[in-house]
Structure formats: structure tokens, C-alpha cells
Amino acid sequence: LGDVYKRQVYQEGIYLGYRYFETRYEDVVMGTAKAGDYNWATTVAYPFGYGDSYTTFAYSNFNVTESDDAFTVTLKVTNTGKTFSGKETVQIYFQSPYTAYDKANGIEKAAAELCGFAKTDVLAPGASETVNITVDKSELRTYDANNAKTYIVDAGDYYFTAATDSHNAVNNILAAKGYTVENTNGRMTEDGNTDLVWKWTNDTLDTTTFSTGANGTAITNLFDEADPNKSSSEPGEVTWLSPVSYTHLTL
């Protein structure tokens, strides 16, 4: 008799931690079909990136410049408290487009991805510092396992934002898309800051820039049989979590 093999399959895919909570939150705010009954405020106690401090900080003069291989984010951080000195960790998040191509080919995208961060020096009350953070363009790539079978960069609009945490980042991006607490009937937890958002547009789907490694070797699928949906013994039996339908995941 042949051996019997068993394995555990985690259906969440990329939607673990903040990538799930913030993606579903954005879908609820935007009224995306099948987002379901989900309340971010009663689900998440502290968002990814959250930190306490004895003082407060404000961001200003947000700017992003593009070079051939990277984006450079610059912003001014000011200690707005009156008593305590402190350091601030500036976090940079981006959102990539979730396109028809992605949906057709089983590619998933989170509402926000951390792509860079930097910590200021100790700032006295009222003091400021300009922070520079470099984000390599490779951060924008997504692996397409089903069609291109290599890394791609989707066509569409990419949003970059400086934020205090992942939830703040998504609210900033939602604000840049025109959403507010008022026009979403309170589905949005707070208004975002459009002054801390920059949009970059990729005109065409790119399937070549990140399709080879540093040594020139082609990057492509090697172990398709490890995917239960591509295995000859159990094809198509696993439904991965996707914003297209949250119905098979409960909290």
C-alpha cells in the first residue's frame, strides 16, 4: 500500500497581521462588494507600528523624488510637545494597485505595505529634523505565480505615505482617494492627511525588470507541485483568502 501524506494548508496567503486588518478595513470604507460585517475599531487594539511616547510629533514638508532605481522620501519631523525630548520613528508605507490582471491571475495585494523607516535623533520640545528615507523600486514588485511566473510591477497608481502606524497610513491613502469620515457615514475611523501622500503612476504592466536575479539567472517557478492547487493529486481544492470574498474567514 502506498504511504498516506497529510499536510496543513494556511489559506490566509498574504493576509496575515496588519495586511489583513487594514485591507479589510479599506474595503469596508470604500464599500467594496463582499467586504462583509467588519469593525476595525473593535477588532484591533493597537495597529502595526504603534508606539507610545511622552511627547508628540508632527510631520511636514513631505516630498518624494524618483531616480532610476529608487524613491527618496523627505519630510520634516517636529517635536510639538512642551516638556519632554524624544525620538520619533518615521514609517513609510505604499499601496499598489489591485488590478483586473491581479484578480484574474490570483495575485493578492494588501492595502498598505511598510517599505521604509528611519528614527530621528533626540529632539527637544520645538526642535525639528529633516529625515530622508530611500525606498528601492524592487519594493513594488509582486510575484505572479500563475501567468508571468516571475516578478511583475503592475500598471496603475501607487500611493506612498508617511505615517505613525499602518492604520494611519491607510487613512492617509483613503483621504488621497477622496474618502472622509463624513462621506463614508462614519465607516472611516478618522480623516487622513493628504499632505503626507504622493502618487506615482506606472503606465504599463512590467514583467521584465525584476525577472532576473543579480547573477542573470531567470526568476521563475520551480516547485509548482508544492502548490496544492497545482498538484496532480489535489488540483483546485484550496480556496485562498482574497478581498474578492471574505466569507470563509471569520474572526
Language model feature labels by segment:
Residues 7-57:
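Catalytic cores of secreted or luminal carbohydrate-active enzymes
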Residues 1-3, 16-17, 26-31, 85-87, ...:
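Acidic/polar loop patches that form or flank catalytic/metal-binding clefts of enzymes
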Residues 36-244:
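Intrinsically disordered, low-complexity Ser/Thr/Gly-rich stretches
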